[in-house]
Amino acid sequence: MTRILSVFKTAKTGVLNAAAHRYRGFSKAGVRLMSVKAQTANLVLEDGTKIKGYSFGHPASVAGEVIFNTGLGGYVEAVTDPSYHGQILTLTNPIIGNGGAPDTKARDAYGLMKYIESENIQASGLLVLDYSHEYSHWGAVKSLSEWLHEEKVPALCGIDTRMLAKKIRDNKGAVLGKIEFEGQPVEFIDPNKRNLIAEVSTKETKVFGKGNPVRIVAVDCGVKHNIIRQLVKRGAEVHLVPWNHDFSQMEYDGLLITSGPGNPELAKPLIQNLKKVFQSDRPEPIFGICKGNEIAALAAGGKTYRLPMANRGQNQPVMITLNGQAFITAQNHAYAVDNNSLPAGWKPLFVNINDQSNEGIMHETKPIFTSQFHPEANPGPVDTEFLFDVYMSLIKKGKGTTLTSVMPKPALQSKRIDVAKVLILGSGGLSIGQAGEFDYSGSQAVKAMKEENVKTVLMNPNIASVQTNEVGLKQADTVYFLPITPQFVTEVIKAEKTDGIILGMGGQTALNCGVELFKRGVLKEYGVRVLGTSVESIMFTEDRQLFSDKLNEIKEPIAPSFAVESVKDALEAADKIGYPVMIRSAYALGGLGSGLCPDKETLTDLATKALAMTNQILVERSVVGWKEIEYEVVRDAADNCVTVCNMENVDAMGVHTGDSIVVAPCQTLSNEECQMLRAVSIKVVRHLGIVGECNIQFALHPTSLEYVIIEVNARLSRSSALASKATGYPLAFIAAKIALGIPLPEIKNVVSGKTTACFEPSLDYMVTKIPRWDLDRFHGASGLIGSSMKSVGEVMAIGRTFEESFQKALRMCHPSVDGFTSNLPMNKAWSSDVNLRKEMAEPTSTRMYSMAKAIQSGISLDEINKLTAIDKWFLYKMQGILNMEKTLKGSRSESVPEETLRRAKQIGFSDRYIGKCLGLSETQTRELRLNKNVKPWVKQIDTLAAEYPAITNYLYLTYNGQEHDIKFDDHGMMVLGCGPYHIGSSVEFDWCAVSSIRTLRHVGKKTVVVNCNPETVSTDFDECDKLYFEELSQERIMDVFQLEQCDGCIISVGGQIPNNLAVPLYKNGVKIMGTSPMQIDRAEDRSIFSAVLDELQIAQAPWKAVNSLDDALQFTKTVGYPCLLRPSYVLSGSAMNVVYGEEELKTFLAEATRVSQEHPVVITKFIEGAREVEMDAVGKEGRVISHAISEHVEDAGVHSGDATLMIPTQSISQGAIEKVKIATKKIATAFAISGPFNVQFLVRGNDVLVIECNLRASRSFPFVSKTLGVDFIDVATKVMIGEKIDESSLPTLERPVIPADYVGIKAPMFSWPRLRGADPVLKCEMASTGEVACFGQNVYSAFLKAMISTGFKLPQKGILIGIQHSFRPHFLGTAQTLKDEGFKLYATEATADWLNANDITATPVAWPSQEGQSGPSSIYKLIKEGNIDMVINLPNNNTKYVRDNFAIRRTAVDTGTALLTNFQVVKMFAEAIKYSGDLDAKSLFHYRQFGGAKPS
């Protein structure tokens, strides 16, 4: 539906110029359409169905057969295909008209229509869901609406095209209908009773390519001009003759029977003429296309029949019977040849892999062949265009040439790979650029291997991942929590005797490790076969020079570039190319080490930093401002290729795709552009030898067909996960099957259960991905986004208009956001001197809000387009949203029209957003909406746009529909997922959600899952009974809960976002399982919780709830500094800070108040020198039935998410542990806990103080569960649903389970290299992006393995030490240990003096600010020369040389040098180096087998 449905429907007709002022940026045609009442008409079907639509074509009634096409593009070509003559065409692609219409009168050099497929529009009428009145494409000269008016063709939008497609499908593909305008009644007409071929065929002979050497007679059944073009450009002179012309006596070198509409049996003269040729001895080759296939079969004596479901789309898979090769084809036909009716001498040439229908025939001895599909495409894929070459070869080679002799031979034959045990490498801890998508892909790979009875060994230190579960039907046979390094992988290969390895499911980490194993000869030595893409092919894609060379071999363009290995060479390369240039690193992840360099100074800086991390960079011409387009390509070992999804970055080149807003499918590309890039994708992937799945990225010039290839990722990637969830096509699962040698046609499409995986999904919706950044956490870090990725997570929203999915996605990213508004997330205020033009030209994480503000400020769309290079089509849509906001704000709540309200919902407005515009609360808006019967519809993702029924329940909600796709009779248990990964909420909460879902299903409960994160396992549709890929908001949860009539809702396993919804959902009638939401509210509110602790006589630090700065100052005078500020209802320590003085107090209090506006901020005395202890537990009606106690390595002051955890505790006294248990017991009772919870304590000696309590699962639940061998979420879920539990084996407070012969260490994973300018020190506010865990026979070996797993490089030579004076009394022993272990010590001047004075030799180095002066060597030089390979820098609030110490830490990070900034970690590291012994490569199972976690 379109803008005209509501606001523009009710707008008064006025002077056009006045309207133009109101809708700045829109074309006059668009303004005219928006300024008058939209004309309506009805679509009436012969069964009596009547659907109202809105006219955007010629306002005249018409009747015909209603059919649907599932193609994702090419509406210009489609409507001019003569095969649609007499038909009312329904396009399931939901958004039509984006690219307008080209010059529809233009002709090419051959005299053929240049941009369309016949002289005029052939469809009798057009039906779409959403029509774009404002178009944007460099090749357009008018709108689709204007063209339809010119040709007097009616068209309606606002039609639920999915509903219509299902109706046509279920009626055996044949439905008569009419578009009927008021006062223009028409009767139903069945065009199939007419000879449609006669109606569209030429009335006279026409010649094209006159003078060409090969004479072809083409019998016109309704020819598409591209068929003629394909022949003429290959040297044919084409004589196009009428359908009933007797060609049997004509002279020709070849005969062609073209495509066309209708029932082939009505073309009797043509059939008779062709039969005469068949029965003669004429040797000339004959080719039939589409209708030509049916005519040929009838002339040969065969039969045709009407298909139960017509094949109309651009993704039909066919197989050639000669060699089994598969192709993706464009099709448009309702009739098919009956294979069983073919007479002797004839046989099928092509077969449809889905429905097994005939797709072409051939004569066994004569040069006659046909295709039911369209090899000329237009629209659609050009995979079978080679058939024109085959036809021309038959002609040119002459008599005696057989079809098999000229048909291309398949490049490869697929053979099942015989492996017994496969090693799958995971990606390790989550980091920026490498997040939860690899948990999803690895889990899928394990599932695929198990289906094929292949044993799996999984190696991944990411303890929080679902794939590293040790038990379950979907889990690997053996799991190793070890670093993904060549050393440890080699040990596992030796121990497990694996004969296969998969490198493509673990991101860059696994890929780089695999390449190194290959280079060292390890894989060859132990007979390990790389499954899927070979290492050689991986190296072609990762090494920038090799990649460039390979593309040059096939003459595919990349940006002019030079691979260099020094800064000097980089500067020389830039001089040759010309500034600006882009640099990219080899073997790097997420654009790390890349950047735009406008000048020599920037290039010198970026190249220096990049070459510190890698040995090669590429300096290339900048294509900033071009469109960035991605294709996901799957290729099997038999050379079958499909492109599963194309994606368009809303942000232009210059912003890393991981930091870009991305839509799928592409919205602003023509069919020509899409098919050009698709064909290139397949060509490149074949040339590189990819086997499995890969991603290819293009830069496409915004106003021409010029493109360059940016890169190829020969592995599963972030984009792969997005494409999988966007389409429903399980890429990782399919890639794993392909890696075993299974060809695509033999793999089932799990969504339909009937069709093959050798196809390309059709979408009748669109998705929008928006990244989630947490840059505000990193003081000093630049807010600019560019070619190096900075986002920590992402969301994906599904809708049937761009605006619907776009606004959904914005809200998914930040619960505080209403949609596309000028209000910043988290209630932030705009700077008083904000420069909107600069904000748009230099992208930041808040650019979308800047654009909204700019539009509202009157900056034109043309200027915004110039500043951002964002296509104007997206800008038109954004402006439409803001126009609706203006309309709503000008409306009265009691009189707002139903159509306006409905339209606002159709373009993605939330109840809360509408309420703010109308002056209503969210609840009042919901009541208003429901009273007007404005409700969402549930739709399925089925991969085939309703062409086949789906057997999975992968769902979303939309207001752009007219029926539900499913029934609501399960009444399942709802589980809320974690939403976008961000700092503090990562894969550990997905693990919790999945564990809960699996438990529910195990005990026989139906499950309804709601989540919006495409990187998660919980959003795998086969993990639950119903998956709603939807917002985690009060409005949407209530929609789903009420539709499904769920038995209850579990909110405690998804982290803080669902936890914050507990009270509002409860107050609106949602049954919350487990602990009461009112108790959750008491625990989340810092002041109430502290008061309860006082009542329970549980010790805590002195505290006070403060409502003003004066309150806070009064408290600090009483207890003294330092103090800790703690807002309520936050995750990962947001706005939590230790303050050491009044100025800090003022700054941090303002921040804490902003993020916690509805609850008081609590200030507590900060206890120094205390150790933090965590209690993870499960309560049952106030009783603790399962618990685990872990100890932090770091003292308090470091956020628990950034801390290094140890199980069992190492330094906590038994007396303190008992106090921890007593306090836990009291809290569980006081809050009547039923479900998971976490309590954090401070311990100093035997003194124990409570810090906080979370009445939900914590991020350490996966770690404690796997370490102890007890799934805490399984237990908690059973408690919450009232399932009976055997408590005898659980680690209760009375019977703790403590590992006896091993220790588990969980270590944080940081992404400092990406956050330029951020200070890599640990504070109260969490900064880590992921975590790992390893196990060892002692704490030291576990610690070192965990550190290595984070990417920490153990030093081999020298260590630089710089410590603040107060650390000296405790540090001397550590320094001595490091010296004794053989490290050469360097130190900043004061630290060096102190060490030397204490007989520990240390070489002094200059402060960064003193570099270049005479005296000690510079830090940078020592690091660059390899003398220093670890830095210990221990600052505190009294540090003198603040800038210099920061410079040292940043230098370490930017050069990839190991860095430690916490004293307790440094101490543990030194002891571990001394006492750890050899680092074994055992799995957790090995430790448990010979020792284990035992009841104490």
UniProtKB/Swiss-Prot annotation:
Residues 215-401 form the Glutamine amidotransferase type-1 domain. GO terms for molecular function: ATP binding; carbamoyl-phosphate synthase (ammonia) activity; carbamoyl-phosphate synthase (glutamine-hydrolyzing) activity; metal ion binding. Transmembrane segments: none annotated. It catalyses: hydrogencarbonate + NH4(+) + 2 ATP = carbamoyl phosphate + 2 ADP + phosphate + 2 H(+). Requires N-acetyl-L-glutamate (NAG) as an allosteric activator. Residues 34-214 are annotated as: Anthranilate phosphoribosyltransferase homolog. It comes from the Eukaryota. GO terms for cellular component: carbamoyl-phosphate synthase complex; mitochondrion. Residues 1352-1496 form the MGS-like domain. N-acetyl-L-glutamate binds at residues 1388, 1391, 1407, 1433, 1436, 1445. PROSITE patterns: ATP_GRASP, CPSASE_1, CPSASE_2, GATASE_TYPE_1, MGS. Residues 548-740, 1090-1281 form the ATP-grasp domain. Disulfide bonds: none annotated. The active site is at 290 (for gatase activity). PANTHER family: CARBAMOYL-PHOSPHATE SYNTHASE ARGININE-SPECIFIC SMALL CHAIN (PTHR11405:SF4), CARBAMOYLTRANSFERASE FAMILY MEMBER (PTHR11405). This is Carbamoyl-phosphate synthase [ammonia], mitochondrial.
